Amino acid sequence: MSTHDDTSAAPSGPRRLKPYQLSIAIGSFMAIFTLMSGVLPLITKWKSDSPIHRQVFEGIPGPIQLAFYTVIPAMLLWGSFRFADRMRNWERGTSDRRRTTAKNAKRRLADFRAGVYMRTLLRDSAAGLMHSMMYFGFLVLLGVTTALELDHQLPESLKFLHGDVYRGYVLIGDLAGLVFTAGVVWAIVRRYIQRPYRIRIKSKPEHAIILGVMLLIGVSGFGAEMFRIAKSTAGGVNMDHEKWSFIGYPLASLVDGWAPRSLELWHQGWWIAHVVAFIAFLAILPITMLRHIFTSPLNMYLKDRDRPKGAMRAMPNLTETSLETFGASVVEDFTWKQLLDTDSCTMCGRCTSVCPAHATGKPLDPR
């Protein structure tokens, strides 16, 4: 009789949803939602009768609208699969128990909030304020765009972006756009003009691409708004309610008197540039350090406080172990949490700037 356990007939329990599958599911949902948000208005044809509102896709040709609702869902799907690839890479690592329990749940939620609010980064007042301007400004802009799209889907009786609500809406949108764009300009100046040591030693070409795309998002947004207001004014539409757009409205006065056709073409050009910039943002999000927007808060949530920060794991007894290699030479030598750490790194250079080995001039770097 065999003394080995026979596991061949062991019942298989319910399959758990893996992290990479969750990424694909979220991306698929967002892609389908975006696609349907383009189809639904074509079927319902619900429009607002209020004179104080904004017509979505005003002056944008149908083929460009079709391209918008085709490319954006495709990019959302693409991004979700690229994130899934990163998560599957984490699964190549060895086990590392990071289970959430009743004992550590409250502490982990506090750590997660600290990651979302960038509490650690705010210790550096300049860098913290700069990143906050970009991060929270972008989130508000995303919320503004989402609110406009939701209003676009609703019947007349439920639409909410009109009257005083719309005035407040454009005020918040311009304020968020100004804060976001100013933050990006500050980041460019800090990285390529002021160039503090810890940033200078970590700058890579992808940083220029990221900042360029983000700057184009901000500038093109104001450009599209500027010419949308100017075009409508030239067409005889009363746009006094757009005075609450304290950036776009004054800019529109700079092109007062231009030919209506020129204003229309400029509006379309800036609108297309804005959408292309956002598509580029979706393209680089999962494949550059921008992914730390998602991975850093997750990493802080999963950090281990049971061991002192930086403490090394004990090595096995070298005379008794059967290991053929020590340390890490291939991906599989790391834990899945260590692989998540690498995808959460923002390449800020703080660890390098305080590393005593690096300070001696030796080619050693914790990053």
Segments the model singles out, each with a brief description of its role:
Residues 2-328:
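Membrane-embedded alpha-helical bundles of multi-pass integral membrane proteins
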Residues 173, 209, 333-336, 343:
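Generic detector of short alpha-helix boundary/capping microenvironments
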Residues 320-337, 359-360:
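Membrane-proximal linker segments that couple transmembrane helices to downstream signaling/catalytic modules
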Residues 336-367:
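Structured cytosolic domains appended to multi-pass membrane proteins
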